[in-house]
Amino acid sequence: MNLPPDALHENVYAFALARDQVESYCNQCLTSMAELKKCSACRRLAYCSQECQRADWKLHKVECKAIKTHNEVANDSIRLVMRIAGKLSRNEDGEIEAYYIPGVARNFQNLEHHPSSYDADEESFVKEYFQFAIAPHPDRDLIKLIFQKVSINSFVVGNSTGNPIGVGLCIKLSAANHSCKPLTRVCYRNRTAMLVPVSSELPSTLEGACHSYIDELMPRDMRRDTLKKKYKFLCQCDGCLDEDRNARMEAWTCGICVKGWMRNKENGQCELCGWTMSKDHFELCRTAEEAGIAARSRLANDAIPLETKRNLCEKLLDLFQDTLHDHNVHRIPVLRCLYICSLAAQNITAAAKTGGTLLSIMLVYQNTTDPAILFQKYQLAQLFCAAGAKTQATKLLQEIEEPLEKIYTPDSMICRNVYCMILKARNLS
């Protein structure tokens, strides 16, 4: 039986915008517009109308007092838990009933969670929560329970260009399982969350509308370690069981034909020319791989200056030359970091080159209609327009125009931007 059209859509049960986004989007409906009005009390959270501000007040009034007291906005996870506690105090558990929902009905109370006797992250969160919250406080065990459920059921909230702007919780859509080779991607039309199919293959059940809980463009062992630590399960999804795909993700470059790929093990053979890896080549490739793994934490460290990161990225890419295959996912964190560094330096040419290289790897493992691919092409098209490369920009924009219309509707901000860029590219000729 096919799912009804609205089965993979849901009005978010609760959400909280990131600190740096609370003044850029309406904190009730997630509309983005030039004229947002701030809350007259805390002067931090913004709204698109008085109607939205009144609708949000029952949740905002508790955090509003805390913001005024501390003269700062807490992080989005703390405020999301605070908002959910407010909803539960009014018996708003978000229950949804439908024949395709596991158990027919689903609400906050029956969301999965992983209770434990002691968890350092949980204890740290609870301590930080009560440092921000203003009395009267909810029960400490309730805050722990909400945190446990939010930790494994929440989604990143994004805007129509795929950029993260906060965190939210969906009651119905959180029933969808994980896959490292996802069938859907989480997208948003304002505060309506959607599980958007990444290809023509449509899920037949809500649980089977698998999306990736993590960045799936990592080696299998890293994916499994991440999932085990946060979600407490050993992943056995289609992506993890696809041996050829996983081997390609960590492939090394052939030392003879260069274009061929080899499994990252001693005596590996090139899948193209059949050459058996020499001991010297094995050591070179192993060194490059270990360097890429070791650099991940430094590349993700915001305290390290971008110029330092840029130099590290360039050295790593030199090391990866003729060792890690062009489609090896260990390249991705390096390329993402270098892309950000190039944008920060306003080096449009370098950013476009790096973004294009990143896209070529993504296309090996993700479908052309996957929103992740569409957003990457959208960013590249913006760079090509800025650089005056009309042919490249037009090609990308035409490829993403129709898929984005299906996801967001022709009147959405991202689609209007695409139309404007197409016109701009034509005027460049």
Swiss-Prot record:
InterPro entries named among the record's database cross-references: H3K4_H4K5_MeTrfase, SET_dom_sf, TPR-like_helical_dom_sf, Znf_MYND
Superkingdom classification of source: Eukaryota
Pfam families: zf-MYND
Binding, Zn(2+) 1: C26, C29, C48, C52
Compartment(s) of residence: Nucleus
GO molecular-function terms, A-Z: DNA binding; zinc ion binding
Residues annotated for Zn(2+) 2 binding in this entry: C39, C42, H60, C64
Residue intervals of every MYND-type zinc finger in the record: 26-64
GO cellular component, one term: nucleus
PROSITE patterns: ZF_MYND_1, ZF_MYND_2
Signal peptide segment: none
Keyword annotations from UniProtKB, A to Z: DNA-binding, Metal-binding, Nucleus, Zinc, Zinc-finger
The protein's name in its UniProt record: SET domain-containing protein 14
